[in-house]
Amino acid sequence: MVEGLSEEKANELRFIELVYYFQQLAMVALGKLVNPGTNQAERHLPQAKAMIDTLRMLKAKSKGNVSDTEQKLIDQVILNLGLNYADEAAKPSAAPPT
């Protein structure tokens, strides 16, 4: 348990951290954030989609069992990632080297 917090509050913090973790992974896969392993922005749309799908699954599985704050957060993150994914998917792939 997180020091000094009730189990309920600690779990709320863990849920929020998990949502932000998947959001960050998706943003790296979308090329919106620099990949800390390569120090470059790289697009991997299938990975981004997997992270978004995982968040959608988490939302469905936790329905009715999260606070209003948690629900608003996951809804907003999924919406934001979905819009960013659509934006990136609409862009042409990098041109092949000549």
Where are the language model's segments positioned?
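N-terminal intrinsically disordered, cationic/polar leader segments
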Residues: M1-D53, M57, T69-T98
